[in-house]
Amino acid sequence: MQQQGETKDQYNTFGLRLVRNSVGVSVLGLDGFVKFIKGGSGGSNGGSSSAKKIDKEEQKKFLKFRAFQAKIGTFYNTNFAFSFPLNETLKGWFDKHRGLILANALVKVTLDTKEKASKALVDAFSSYKNWLSEYTPVGLATTMISFYFDQMKALNNKLLERVRSLNQNVNQANPTPWLNGLSAKLPYVNTNGNYEKLNNYFTFLITKVLWPKVGTEDTNVSEEKSKLKTKTEDVNKIREKILNNIDSKLKTFVQKLKPTLAPRPAYSNVILLNINNDKVWSAGANWSLAVLLDPKKVNPLSFMLLKQMFDQNSLFKKAKTLFENIQNKAKTSGSGKSGTTTNDDADALSKVIGNYYYNTWAKLTDKSIYGNLKDDKFDDLFKLAFDSSINEKSFNVDYKAVIEHYRFIYTLEWLVDKNLKNFKDLLKANLKFGEIAFIAYKNTETQNFSNPQGIFGSYFNYENETNAAKSATQIIDPNSFFYKTTTKPEAKTTQSANTAVMVQNTQMNNQQTNSYGFTGLSTSSGSMLGAATQQAILDQITKTSLQQYGSQADLKKIIGETKNQLLLDRIANQLIALKPNTSGNSGTQKTIAAYFQTDAVGNPTLDFKAKQKLLLDVLDQYKDFFGNNAQAVQRDSGKSGTGNYLTYTDGSDKITYLQFSYKDIDGLSLSSSNGTSSKFASDVVAALLLFQAAYKGTQQLALSSINKPQLPIGDKRIKTGIDLLK
């Protein structure tokens, strides 16, 4: 409400706002703002914001005046209400930080030492006052800084919530845009999920009020041309710099405390601390340690011990270097610049690393919190989510996510090391010779993948995103649509003229870029595809191929040398499902049916040697099944494998697949220049490696080979914390 003595120009200087809500259109302004803001006069825009200051004493007087009016009921407008419940507002804060607040009060209070109780308190507190005077304000300021960074994100989320229902009305299967009425986009621009202009309020409090309490503000980081920086990357740098200051203060404080391990009580392994042989300091330290080692949640001490185990491992150091090279290669490739690394492993893995980033994004309940994709570059968006999840320079480190990342990159290096030795050994241990397997791409019949199920808003752009959303795609599940490689498997079938080549594309300005639903390696025991689709493709391969045995010569050698009846039976069962070619030189009078003949009492008519000879005699009839002669294929030019892809139709999806056999394992490589002719493109192998490295069973196997240092802890609370990180 406007106060007496305020002019129209004065009031407009601080801005009225028109707000439309369920009751209509309202005009809002801050009550009494012109009374306690000093400076900033002149100019149509109200002068420089840096020249305006809050007169706290005037603000207190104004709030007290309003509270007095409310209490005695003197408001001339009965619809006007004023509430400033300070006690209720501060109670939760006080209860949560009671120790810090009381310590801060004690170092500042002046007590009358003539009174015995006060003198006793002063005497008892005197030996601790200097240290507490120095470090208690640091603790309080740290708590407030963390709180304001959290509130910065909370404000963004509140604004995004406002537009969520509006977008839903537009994006749902049966749109009802009229329910949004005259709703307009937010007045603030959203970049990567952040309303950066609104960061100014929080960055002012953090840098100007609180930073000096924990260190010294670095204006090179926080300001540009005497104005506060508010962009997300700048806010992150401010936070990192402040955390460095806090860390320095804490290290100095700990050095002064000189903590040592105290003798343990009998029959106890609980860690206890001794601080300068002072019972009070020691009791406080052990109380703090007990709070820190809460067995119900991951604690930072357990995290640091586990992190130390990784950091001291030589293979993990190689893993960190590999992942850094992958990220650098992916970054330069995405920007159109030439890469700086010549590492073939990193080169191939960088093309598919988005699959790893995607796993973090897919777990998000709200997939719009990092904004919209730009130029249909999903990997850039996924990386924002990934980087945020493993950020160790934060007030709220996700310890579990960081350790999971460490496990992943360690396992990836373990698989890649020595020309994929461990990866190949794993495949050989789990894929029997002659077993049918395949790699596949699930290609959905749609051209629009840029806004699956409307998760990036709507074309009305209510959130005022810099990267405006496109029309929603309803048929794509955002939780499972993105797995990809850069290889383009286009298969032409000769079975039907109406069978079209299906590929999964993203579309941007009528220019298509290739992304495919890569589903990894499927075997009889497991697949990312549905069970029915998996079995149908396995059956289709069984009826059309013998590639699982390598070449015809390879299979003849195996049959001639084996002593295994079960292996002969498996080969015979696969041959019986195929149609033999009995023309020409292959037209012997023998058939595979004789293999299964029995006498009157059900005993086989052929012994092992006879069955062995029969298989060798009839094998020429099946020579066409050792290649892909049945179907022609088109491949992308460039670094790709030599294998031929086939297709299988499953409703609205088409599965493009390539058979994988035991004999293919040794030829797998991440290098496109190793002199071998691999059936699988290097980026396909890279994608398989990423999937394998993310598998918990593989991680456990890889980590079992780590040289585990013995940690002489014995404290169950730390062990529980480490278990929670697994």
Swiss-Prot record:
**What protein family does this chain belong to?**
Belongs to the MG307/MG309/MG338 family.
What high-level taxonomic lineage is stated for the organism? Bacteria, Bacillati, Mycoplasmatota, Mycoplasmoidales, Mycoplasmoidaceae
The source organism is Mycoplasma pneumoniae (strain ATCC 29342 / M129 / Subtype 1) (Mycoplasmoides pneumoniae)
Write down a Pfam family by its short name.
Answer: DUF3713
Name of protein: Uncharacterized protein MPN_440
Cite the InterPro entries for this sequence.
DUF3713
